[in-house]
């Protein structure tokens, strides 16, 4: 079995554990409240975050040290992992503080919205911080906007477009600087910017996550006299809600990839076809022939499917929502935000998972 299939299996097990954990916590909420009623909220949240890090650690180690891609381990993994953990812990601590501050009068949606906006605003700084290596600004052909070249030791890092309202800045691996395919990839990203797919994805994902928070709140899933337990329940419910996103969103992401490919095919068809095949190799995602597996677990369609779909595509697209939600869901305390096969044990990809 190749690395891609092993990583897929690892991700499925990892997601399954967080899903079962979250369902169990919500199912035994009353018993948990009785057991921990005398413990302070700060201690509960601190123990919960620390526990989530410990549970996830074996998966991170296997993903980084055993199931690495292209025959080369990430030699900066430990430093990047610590910085990634610091970043996520800071985000979750901020969300918890805002809930302490605002929830009694304003509910859970406002603290979540503020946290999501801050996560979006700091995406660029977080990427540079977690990567822990050199970067520089550059001008690239076919992309009108700010470009950052990042010297990244994670070989499956592809960068992408930064979140933002009307934003047109991108980040690329420094290893692509001399690539003959950089021009066509920049053209693809320009198509994404021109069609406002980043903005569409941003609005859709904010709506999706706030809808999940609101449903949980109206159903009383978070209610507890101990605000710490309320935050734990919020985290568990949003982990379940994010699982629905993992199952439903890849199909919508496919339509965006097909449409961008369709428009880019008019620019340089031969180069695009070569790049599609090369890109699949770079991100180390096998062309799984099982259609159900493709539609659920792979937001980026197989190289063969992309090439076969170049002549026609739907223009009704939400953007690359599936994997972008992995990063955005930091703002809703999603325990599985770094448990998918594409980013397990790859700290920089916790912020920028591969997308096309």
Residue ranges and their predicted role:
Residues 1-223, 248-334, 350-356:
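Polar-ligand-bearing catalytic/cofactor-coordination segments
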Residues 224-240:
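Loop-to-helix entry and N-terminal half of a specific, functionally important transmembrane alpha helix
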